[in-house]
Amino acid sequence: MDEQVTLPPVADLTEAGPLKDRFLQAISSGTSLTVDASAVQRVSSPCLQVLVAGKQSFAKAGGASLTITDPSEAFRETASVLGLLDALELGK
C-alpha cells in the first residue's frame, strides 16, 4: 500500500515535526510513502534532516519505502548545497 505526502511551498521547521510523525506512522504500519516535492519554493535544513532520517529509517525497518519525487529546483538546490542529494537518492 502506497500513500502520498505533498510538501508545501515552504517546507520549514513547522513542517518537520508533522512530517516525522507521518513517517513514524507509516513505518509502524508498513506503508510506503511517496513525497511529492514539486511545489517546494523554500526548504529548511530541519525538514531535509527529517527526510534524510526518514529515508534511513524506512530502509532499516524494511517492508516499506520512502521515495521523493519531482523535486523542485529550489528543493534540489538546497539539498545540493547541504550535500544531501545522495542521502535523499536524488542523484546529481
Each language-model region and where it sits:
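STAS-like cytosolic regulatory interaction modules
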Residues: M1-P46, V52-K92
